From Swiss-Prot:
PANTHER family the UniProt entry points to: APG9 AUTOPHAGY 9, AUTOPHAGY-RELATED PROTEIN 9
Gene: ATG9
Keywords: Autophagy, Cytoplasmic vesicle, Endoplasmic reticulum, Glycoprotein, Golgi apparatus, Lipid transport, Membrane, Phosphoprotein, Transmembrane, Transmembrane helix, Transport
Acidic residues: compositionally biased ranges: 77-86, 761-779
Example of a GO cellular component annotation carried by this entry: phagophore
Region Disordered: start-end pairs: 28-118, 188-216, 755-779
Enzymatic reactions: a 1,2-diacyl-sn-glycero-3-phosphocholine(in) = a 1,2-diacyl-sn-glycero-3-phosphocholine(out); a 1,2-diacyl-sn-glycero-3-phospho-L-serine(in) = a 1,2-diacyl-sn-glycero-3-phospho-L-serine(out); a 1,2-diacyl-sn-glycero-3-phosphoethanolamine(in) = a 1,2-diacyl-sn-glycero-3-phosphoethanolamine(out); a 1,2-diacyl-sn-glycero-3-phospho-(1D-myo-inositol-3-phosphate)(in) = a 1,2-diacyl-sn-glycero-3-phospho-(1D-myo-inositol-3-phosphate)(out)
Keyword match Glycoprotein: yes
Identification of the protein by name: Autophagy-related protein 9
Amino acid sequence: MEQSGHEPGKNTFLSRVFGLQSDDVSTSIHTQELSTIPLDEDESNHGALVESEDDEDHNDGVRLLESDPGTSTQDSLESDTSEEDERINGINSDSQVIDTSRPLLSKKETMELHPFGSQNGRIMESSIKLGQPSSDEEDLINVNESLQPDLENRINPIYHEDKLDKALGNSSKNIRTSTFLDRVLKPNDVKKNSTKKRQNSHNYNPTSTYTNSSSNTFLNTVKGEKSSKKYKLKRPNILNALSVVNNMPERRLNTLSPKERALWKWANVDNLDLFLQDAYNYYLGNGFHCIILQKVLNILTLLFVVFVSSFMGYCVDYSKLPTSTRFSEIKIDHCYSQNITGFTKFLLFLFYGFVILKVIQLYFDINNIREMKLFYHYLLNISDDELQTIPWQNIIQQLMYLKDQNALTANVVAVKAKNKLNAHGIANRIMRKENYLIALYNNDILDLRFPIPFFGSQPLTKTLEWNINLCVMGYVFNEAGFIKQGFLKATQKEYFANELRKRFMLAGFLNIILSPFLVSYFVLLYFFRYFNEYKTSPENIGARQYTPMAEWKFREYNELYHIFRKRIGLSNPLASKYVDQFPKEKTNILLKFVSFISGSFVAILAILALWDPENFLNFEVTHDKTVLFYITVLGAIWSISQGSVSTEYHVFDPEETLRELAEYTHYLPDSWKDRYHTEGVKQEFCELYNLRITVLLRELASLITTPFILWFSLPNSAGKMVDFFRESSVYVDGLGYVCKYAVYDGDADAVKKHFGTDGNETTEQDAATEEQDIDSEPDEATKKMMQSYMYFLDDYENDDNLLGKYQIPKKRRESFDNTQYDVSNSNQKNQDDDSDMILANRYTWRKQFKPGQKPELFRIGNHVLNDKTFTQQGSNHLGIDESYARSQISNTAEESNRSSLYNSKYKSPTKGVLGLVKEYYKKSDVGR
C-alpha cells in the first residue's frame, strides 16, 4: 500500500525508545507489518474511531507498528508520554481510561458491547493487528516501506472505570461465543446459509464481526474465588514502585532492591513467550534449589558414566583378578597418561570441554533462575516451598492480578500482549511449538518408514523425536519463538521444502558420525540404571510403559506437561489391567518350559556344589566360565521366566476397562468400536503401551536406524510439512500466529487468516470460503480439537482440579452420578436426598453430558442447577472480565457469574458455546 502526501512528523514513541525521529527509521519498517487504523471523522462520537466514507480509499488510515510479545515495542495508541501519565493518574482517580483491548466493529454494524454496557453507533472496518512481528525471513517478501504519523490526540476515552466496575455485576444479553467453534459445530445447512450471506455482502470483513466476548468467556479467567478458599495468597501490590519501571536505566539495576529488580524485569519483558515458558519451567522444577540440584546431578551423572567406563576399561588389569585379593593389586598406576593415547584421549578432551561448557551454562542458568525466584517471591507472593503443592491455576491468578496493576503503566512492554494474559493465552504461549507437534503427529504428516523393503514404519523414539525437533521446529520458528512468515506464503513452499530436505540430510550425516559414541554412552547408562532393578525384581522385565508416539497421541492441545504427566501416570494401573485380562497361554507354555530347563540346571549344579563347596564353585564348566557364573545366569533366567507366567484369574471385561482407561488417556478411536474384546485392538493398544525392555531396545536400535530415516524417508515429507504449517496457522491479536487447533476460546472470533493461497492478505472471496475450509477438516482433527476444548474447560473450571502437580482429588460420593435420577420419586424423597445430590454432584463435562442424564441437575461451584434456576436465570452469561481485580467487585455478581455460562440457553441447544458443544456431543463419540 502506498502512502503519499504525508510529511513524516515526530514520532514520540520511536524517539523515546530508539532516540530517533520517525523519518530516520521510516525505511527500516515493512509495510506488511503495519496495520491500518482509520482516522476519526467526528472526535466527539464517544471516542470511536470512524472510517472514511470512501470504502475503497484506504490512504486515510494510519499505519502502526504491530505490537509483539517478543519485542520491546509499545502499543502505538498509547505511546505518548502525557497519555501514559494520564493513565497512571487515572488508576488512583475516577478519570477516564482508554480500553485498548476493546474490539473494533465492522462498518455499518451496531451491537451491544458487554460487560461495558451499550455502545451504539460504533462504525469500524479494521482493527489493530497485534501479536507477532516479522521474522528474519521477511527479505523474501517484496514489500513497500512507509511510516505514518501516530494517532496522537486522536483517541478519546471510551468509558469511565467506575462504569466498568458497575457493569461487571450486571448480566448482559446477546453474548457471542467463538465463531470458530460455531462454524465447526453448527449444522451444515446453517453453514451453507451463512456462506451465502457472506458471499452476498460486498463489504464483509471476517476480522471485525465479533464483540468483546473474549473478555467474558470462561477461558479468559480462572475462578480465583475458588482457589483462594484452598490457598490463601496475597495479591501483588506494585503500585508504590511504579516509578522504578519508568525511570531506572538497565545499567543501574544493581542498585535496586530485590523487589524493585523483579518489578523492573517484569515491566521490561521483551519476549512474553520466553518469559512465561521460564516461569512455567520454574513451577515445573519446584523452585530454585530443586532446579539447581537437578542440573548439578545431571552433570555428575554424565561424569560418572564416562569416568567409570574409562577407568574400568583402561585402569584395571583383569588378568590378575583370579589371583589377587586386593584392589591395589589389579589397579594400573598412571593409566590415564600411559594407557590412554591417541584417538581415545582426543575424545576424552572433547568430553571435558563439553562438561566445561555445561558448567558455564549452569552459571548463567543460576542467574536467570535467581531472577525468576525473585519474581515469584516478591511479585507473585509465592515461595519455593509452596510450588510443590500450589495449583497452576493460582499462578495464573497471580499473574493476572499483576497484569491488572502494571499493564497500563509499563512503557516498554507491548501492552496488548499483556492484555491477553489469561489461562488460554498463557497456555498458547507456553505450548506454541508443542501444539504444532501434537497436530503434526496426530495428522500423520511424517514419513517414518525405514528405507528397506518389508521393514514397515519405524516406531517413534526419543532420538528420532529429538532430531525432528531440531530439524523442523528449529527451522520453522525463529529465535524469538515465532513462526517464520515465509512458511505462511504459498509462493515460498518449494524454497522452504528444499531447505528442510537439506537439514534432514545434514542431520542424518551428523547422526552417522555420532552414533557409535551415543550407542556406547546409552548402553552404559541403561545398564547402570536398570541392572539392579531387574536383578532384585526380575518380574519387572514384564513392566510396560507408553511409547513416545503414544504420548503425542494422548496429549491434548494447550495441555501443560504437569497435567498430562499426572493423568498418564494415573492410567498405568488401568492399562496393565486391560492387557492382563487377555490370556497369554502360548507365552505361558514357553515360559514354563524355559523355567523348567533353567531350574533343572541350577538344581544339578547346586547339589554338586554341596560335595566340595570351596573348589567346585570355581570349577570351569566351559572355557573361563565357572559353576558360580552359570548358577548366577541360570538363576536369573529362572526368576524372570517364573515371574512372567500369568497364574492369576481376571474378570474379563475389556470394554469397560478400556472405556475407564480412556478417561485418563483421552484416546478411544472409532475403529475400536464393538471390537474392544478382540486381539486386534489389544495389539494396537500394546503398540502404544509396550514392554519397557522393548522400548529400551528400540531406543538403542534407533541410534543406528535414525540416520537412514533422516536421509531417505523424512525428506519426502518436507512439502507436506510446509503445507501443514501454512494451513494450520492462524493469527490471533495479541498472540501472533498459533496452531488453529489450539484456539477455542472467545478470542477465536478475532482469528484472521492473514495470508491467502497466493501469499497475499485474505480477500472477501477467501473469507466467504472459510466455512468450506472448516467443513473439509478431517473428522479426527475436529474431534481432537473439540476434545481438547472440553478437557481444557474441565481442567480450569472444575473445583476438583485445583490441585498441585503431585496431588489427586480425594474420593467423593458418586451415588447420584452412578444412579439415574428418577423424576417420578415423591417430593419428600427428593427433599431427603437433596443434600446428598448436592454433595455428590460435582461438575465435570463428562457427567453433565452423559447419555440419559439431565444437564440442568448438575452444579458448578456452589450453585446448584435446577429447573427453578433455569427459569430465573434467563439468558445470563459469564460476565467475568480478564481482570481478577475487577471480577471480584460484588459477591452477588460473583455468585451469578460462576454458573451463568452453563445456565445460558440450555433450552435452546443451538445457541451459545455450551449448547453447541451439547449438540456436537450428541452426534459424536468424543471422550466416551
